[in-house]
Swiss-Prot record:
<protein>
    <recommendedName>
        <fullName>Malate dehydrogenase</fullName>
        <ecNumber>1.1.1.37</ecNumber>
    </recommendedName>
</protein>
<dbReference type="GO" id="GO:0006089">
    <property type="term" value="P:lactate metabolic process"/>
</dbReference>
<feature type="active site" description="Proton acceptor">
    <location>
        <position position="175"/>
    </location>
</feature>
<keyword id="KW-0520">NAD</keyword>
<dbReference type="Pfam" id="PF02866">
    <property type="entry name" value="Ldh_1_C"/>
</dbReference>
<feature type="binding site">
    <location>
        <position position="82"/>
    </location>
    <ligand>
        <name>substrate</name>
    </ligand>
</feature>
<comment type="similarity">
    <text>Belongs to the LDH/MDH superfamily. MDH type 3 family.</text>
</comment>
<dbReference type="GO" id="GO:0030060">
    <property type="term" value="F:L-malate dehydrogenase (NAD+) activity"/>
</dbReference>
<keyword id="KW-0816">Tricarboxylic acid cycle</keyword>
<dbReference type="InterPro" id="IPR015955">
    <property type="entry name" value="Lactate_DH/Glyco_Ohase_4_C"/>
</dbReference>
<dbReference type="InterPro" id="IPR022383">
    <property type="entry name" value="Lactate/malate_DH_C"/>
</dbReference>
<dbReference type="InterPro" id="IPR036291">
    <property type="entry name" value="NAD(P)-bd_dom_sf"/>
</dbReference>
<feature type="binding site">
    <location>
        <begin position="118"/>
        <end position="120"/>
    </location>
    <ligand>
        <name>NAD(+)</name>
    </ligand>
</feature>
<dbReference type="GO" id="GO:0004459">
    <property type="term" value="F:L-lactate dehydrogenase activity"/>
</dbReference>
<dbReference type="InterPro" id="IPR001236">
    <property type="entry name" value="Lactate/malate_DH_N"/>
</dbReference>
<dbReference type="InterPro" id="IPR001557">
    <property type="entry name" value="L-lactate/malate_DH"/>
</dbReference>
<feature type="binding site">
    <location>
        <position position="151"/>
    </location>
    <ligand>
        <name>substrate</name>
    </ligand>
</feature>
Amino acid sequence: MKKISLIGAGQIGGTLAHLIGTKEVADEVVLFDVASGIAKGKALDIAQSSSVDGFNVKFSGTDNYEDIKDSDVIIITAGVPRKPGMSRDDLLGINLKIIKQVAEGIKKNAPNAFVICITNPLDVMVMAFQKFSGLPANKVVGMAGILDSSRFKLFLSLELNVPVKEIEAMVMGGHGDTMVPLPRFTKVSGKPLLDLVKEGKISPERLEEINQRTRDGGAEIVKYLEKGSAFYAPAASGVQMAEAYLKDEKKLLPCAVHLNGEYGVSNVYAGVPVIIGKDGVEKIEQIDLDEKEKKEFMHSIDAVKALWEAASKIDPDLSK
């Protein structure tokens, strides 16, 4: 019996619950929210869709952390979403307080769970959660790289008019304006993307525009929605991570993880390719970055560190 608890029953939380149900990733799903009515209402609504879609999963909604006991996976989406004109970093003070409460609830009731954080600003929130909760770093990860990579793949597929599943691509670094798309490691139908640039299928200038659109991918959606931020693609990305852990898939996925010397970086969470299996983060893959990529990656790391310093001033417990 596999149990997944979702902390936050907003747009991402509700979508996560529905996806987990339709894909039967777990046997039980608990939707937790401080607004218990929203959690209970969504849980009941999704449960009522099970006979239509033909899945067999138990759903419940709660505002009591005791109900997440014995969870195999916990996905955190609790927090305030962005509004137009806001960066992910603008959410820092509000969401830091929320993450601290969530960390206490999980530490007390489900300390053995594999925890996936989706709350923004992502890299600092997952670092703060790990620090507040004391859970082992290999069991605490952030969802960012899968989402950023999926945006990069989509924009390339639209530009090159090829199916998105034919594109292999990866984005590293922090989940923000300094993220690092990696065209050099990108393949289209097995062919290096940079070969297509040489052949004139896509210009270097157009490729850079796609890189920038990837960095702005979340903001573009926030601008359209006006109230709220992306939720379908973030939820799908979170489910992929949960599946890799529960099914011991040993899958290579770009995730925000705790770096301890890899890529020349220590004591920081940032997006890199990792293997996820039954032990959580089982291996951090170190790909050979060139000088330009290294410079961009370190610039992204510096941005994460600067935000971490700001967070530490808001809550001195993070400096301990």
